[in-house]
Each structure stands twice: as C-alpha cells, then as structure tokens.
Amino acid sequence: MSIFNKVTKSFQWGDKTVVMETGEIARQASGAVLVNIDDTVVLATVVGSKQAKPGQDFFPLTVDYIEKTYAAGKIPGSFFKREAKPSELETLTSRLIDRPIRPLFPEGFYNEVHVVIHTISLNPEVDADIAAMIAVSAALSVSGIPFNGPIGAARVGYVNGEYVLNPGQTARKSSQLDLVVAGTEAAVLMVESEAQQLSEEIMLGAVVFGHEQGKVAINAIHELVRDAGKPVWDWQPPAKDETFIAKVTALAEDKLRAAYQIRSKQARTQALREASASVLESLKGEGVEFDAVKVEALLFDIEAKIVRSQILAGEPRIDGRDTRTVRPIEIRNSVLPRTHGSALFTRGETQALVVSTLGTERDAQRIDALAGEFEDRFIFHYNMPPFATGEVGRMGSTKRREIGHGRLAKRALVACLPSKDEFPYTIRVVSEITESNGSSSMASVCGGCLSLMDAGVPMKAHVAGIAMGLIKEDNRFAVLTDILGDEDHLGDMDFKVAGTTNGITALQMDIKIQGITKEIMQVALAQAKEARMHILGKMQEAMGEAKTEISSFAPKLYTMKINPEKIRDVIGKGGATIRALTDETGCQINIEEDGTITIAATEAAKADEAKRRIEEITAEVEVGKVYEGPVTKILDFGALINLLPGKDGLLHISQIAHERVEKVGDYLQEGQVVKVKVLETDDKGRVKLSMKALADRPAGDSGRPAPAERGERRERRDGGASEQQQQ
C-alpha cells in the first residue's frame, strides 16, 4: 500500500491534455499541485500562516515563480552553475500570477501567504505561465486557506481573423495578438496583452473568449477540490467595533471632505496628514484606547466612501475634472543636448523624461531563456525614484513594479517599431519618472514614442497610452478617464490602454472586485479610445513625424552585402583581418552568415574607408583589367604580384617585357610596385598577368616570340606557378 494519497484529474483543453496531481509531492505545504500540459510541468505550493502578525495592517502575499534550468535540459551558465536572482521573465510571471489572486482573499485577512511555483519540465511550445496560474489556483483551492476562487486563465492569439486558444511559440509568430486573461467563473480579474493595432471590438472579443475557455480549468479544479480538498480554515474577519467606527467617522469625516476639496496633490496630501493627526490627538484627549494602525485603516475607508460617493453623484473628481477629461498636457522634444533622442512628457502632475539611445547589433540584449536563446534589439527601462511622489525612500535594485511598467510600455511601442531591415539599430529607451500622480507607465508610452521619433526612429505611427478607472456600487458605476494615484487606490479597476489612431497595441487590466461585466468593459474601451485620440492629437502637434536624420552623436550604420564564401577572407586567420579593420578605421563591423555586413561609425569618412577595404578584400580579379600592386615574391620563372588583399597573380617571365628576359631579378625586385594586366583566370582561381601588354612594342619587333619562348618557356608547360605558390 502506498504512503501517498495521490489524486489526479485530467481534462482536454483545446488541443492539449492537462493533468493535475496532488497528494504525492510537497505534502507539508498547505496546498501543492503538479500540473502537466504536454510535457510542460509546474509545481505550485502554497503555505499560509495560521495567525496574522500583531499590528499587521495589510495582506502579506508573496508570489515567487522560479524556472529551473534542468527543466529544459540545461546547466546554468554562471560561475557557480546554479540559478541566481530572478530573471525579468520570472519577475513578470510572478506579477502575472499575483494580480488575479490577490483580490480574492477576503477583506481583513492579514495572515502571511507564500506562493512558490517551480517550472520543472518545459516543452518550448507550451508556455509555463498559464500552467503556473492554473496550478496556483488549484493549490490555493485545495489548501483550505480562505480564498474566493478558483480562477481560470488562458492565452489568446488572433490568427487569420480567428481567436486561438493557448498558441505556442511557433503559432504566435503569425498571431496579431498575445493576450492573457484570468478570472473566476463570474468575472474577469486580469488582462495582459500586446497587439498589432487591433480594434476595441476584437480586443474585447479576445477577453471574453479567453474568460470562457478559462472556465474549463475552473470546473476541473472544482472536481480536484471535491476529491482532495483540505478542510476550510475556521477564519472569521475581526468583529467591527461599530461604536469606535462611528466615533472616528464623526471626528474625521468633515476634515477629510474638506481635504478632498483641495485640487493640488501636495496640499491635499498635507491636509489629509493633518486630519489624521487631529483625529489621533482627539482620541488621546478623550482617553479612548485605540490601535493607530486600525485608525489609519478606518480613515482610508472613510476617504474611499467620500471620493466614491462624490463621483457617483456626478460631482467633480478629486482634482476638479469630470469623468471624461484628460489632464493638461505639455510636451517638449530634444530636451537633452548630447543624447540621441529625448522628450519631456507632462500630463497634470505626472511627468516622464524619456531618453532614447541608438546602438549597434553588438548592443542587443542576449537573453538565455529557458525556451531558447534570443537577442532583443529593443530595450525599455522604467525608473521611478521616491522623489517622484515627494517622498523619502531608499534607492536600490530595480523593483518588480518598475520591471512590470517597463514591459507594459515596451509592449505598447514594439508594434510600431520599424523592422531590422528598415532600421538596423539596437534601441534602448529609458523612462525617468520625475513626477507621479497616476498612470506613469502610460506617460512613459507617450514620452517613449516622442523620444524615439526625436532620435530619428521611423515609427509606423504615434503611440499614446491612457489609464482608466472605475467606481462601482451596486448597479451604479462611473468610468474615469486619466486616473489620479488616489483614484487608483480608492477605485475598483486599473485599466490601461495604449495604441495608435488605427487600433490598440497594449491592454492591461486589473480589477479589484467581482462583477465587472462585458458592458462595463465596452464603456471603458470606448472612453479610453476618445482619450487616446485626444492625446495623439497633442503628440502630433508637438512632433508630426520622426526626424529624418539621427543625432550627430549616434553611430551611423552602413550596410553592404558580400558573397558569403568571402566571409572568411574578411575575418582572416584567427580574426586578424577584421581586428585590423576595426582598429585602423575606428569602426565597429558586424558580419552575418548571409554576407550582410553592418559598419558602425561616428564619421562617414571612417565608414567609407572600412567599406573600401572590405570591397578590396572581397573583390574578384577581372580579366582584362589593369591592377597596380607590389611584387611579393621573385621566382626563377617569373614573379608573384599582389593584386588585391589576399589575392596574388603570376607574372610569367615571358610576360615581363617584349625583349627576352634571362633573369627576373634584372627587371623586378620584391616590394616594387608595378602595373599589370590580367590575361586570364582558371577554375582553380589562378591568375595570369602581363606587364608587356601595357608596354609599347619596340620598333622592328614583329611580335612573334622567340623559339625558346613559344609555349611560355617549355620548361613550364603548366603556364605558371603552382596553385600553392599563387596562394
């Protein structure tokens, strides 16, 4: 009899079979589920603390997604030969899993929960992120931890006008869409996508399609829970002290309402701090015992109620706008004198200084992903220091939020970048957030597009982004355009849309409540389009099209094509020729397998010199053409003349002069530069040369060779030097 109480559930999902197992591996975790989708295997474990820490005022959920290199049959390439810090993909996948599950833990549940996902086998054609989301949903559901799930998840592609479920790497190459959607049976909770300028209708259809497909996984998880679920924790939210709540509300409400009439963020924040301090002082003065953490939580609830009720009642928003108005926009291009491209994009109290840098192919980011190595020639980095929100904070390594915002901005812009053939540069864009009050990632999209155009990148279209919010109470709702930071915190949805005048290039949605309908998403998309068109108009006014010339400080790229068989000649023995070329011309030279050569230089003259020398190295000797070159070797029967780099020809003794030549050394010396004409070449690449063909014939010379010369000196019937001597 086995020591394991193993339970397995399998289901067909599109063209793939999904197998879920629990009860055999990681049995000491609160919940553990192994998911196998066509040889991609992930293990999701969940552990929850039975008690919340004293004074805990937020839900401490941690999600760690970890890819093991052995999953793809690889050994880590680092010095220590073991997995190191999380890659960007691991960080993004951790966020992707965190976002849909976080809203499903009950309000007031502050016990620490740690979710760990290991990818332990990988089929490159089956993405591990979807398998991981299903595994986490199942692990939480069987664990007994309070969780209002399960969730389902699906990836959606769009190929030939049809939606495709969970397309693999190969299928995605021909897809116009890469969208991941997650949600419960009742509602969508999270969307992450990039698209090739698709319409709002197609995007919404993809969300609905993915949500429906995710329900297949939810049904299977319900079956797994019925057979293997642990008892649900006997957890109850802390009882509310209604008397104390009423006391705090009476002390705070008027002060908070007054604070939310202040339109400036800094002044409003200061007023809110003073209101909070006043409430605490009043409670102390009245001798009321209280927990400061709980009072702060109550004040937040009161603030949310005030702001939400005002908006639903049709009153002005926090900064005085109505629900559809975009904050004032200011744009300045070419902000920095020596960068390749720059733009300052300001929308209300959100500001991004975005800088673009152009580099060569060698500057491309080489990524050793689990599914295979690849090069990325478009890099986008987002930085948000503490001063952007007027706060004191630590500066350290890049945070998960910064990585996520940078990836969203990159996804928004990548659809409108020129192809490598059109613009062979590696591009790095850095968005420095200098002020933030809502939607800094979308400001990065707008500023990034303008910065790229300022750098001379021929974008296919202007790209703008906008963040939408939602306030929903029962059947009443209001969609907010261009949300502020406070509206993000106090609202029910963060809905970011980026795109061009033709369609959407990126869509990200995070919903904190259940019950968001298709109709609400439709309204949000329509309102976002209206705002996007407004911002695009402002951007087009500021910069109608990309600069036609790149910065004088950027490297100039020149391309040329050579016969692939000549690549080794350009590289030379041990790379000697290519090293000499780069050192002597000051250029970077990159050679591809198809014979395409890219020359990067700061000055056109240097590039021209490098190009000329490469042309010399790869040139073919032409019959009938006159060349000038040095004598490289004297032979008894002639001399070897260098015609082109690495290419010599034989000047036979009979072709040196019209008169009879007894000794080659009487006419030629090594190093002497002479003009010669190419008489012929053979299929082995041997070249026959003549000097006398270029010299005037002496008077009285009949032109007939002397008997000893007929047949070009009978001692050499092969007509010249051996093949080895010519080479």
From Swiss-Prot:
Metal-binding among keywords: yes
Residues reported to bind Mg(2+): D488, D494
Domain KH: 555-614
Gene3D superfamilies per the UniProt record, alphabetical: GHMP Kinase, N-terminal domain, K Homology domain, type 1, Nucleic acid-binding proteins
Highest taxon of the lineage: Bacteria
GO cellular component, one term: cytosol
Cofactor: Mg(2+)
Function (record text): Involved in mRNA degradation. Catalyzes the phosphorolysis of single-stranded polyribonucleotides processively in the 3'- to 5'-direction.
Family of the protein in this entry: Belongs to the polyribonucleotide nucleotidyltransferase family.
Descriptive protein name: Polyribonucleotide nucleotidyltransferase
Gene designation per UniProt: pnp
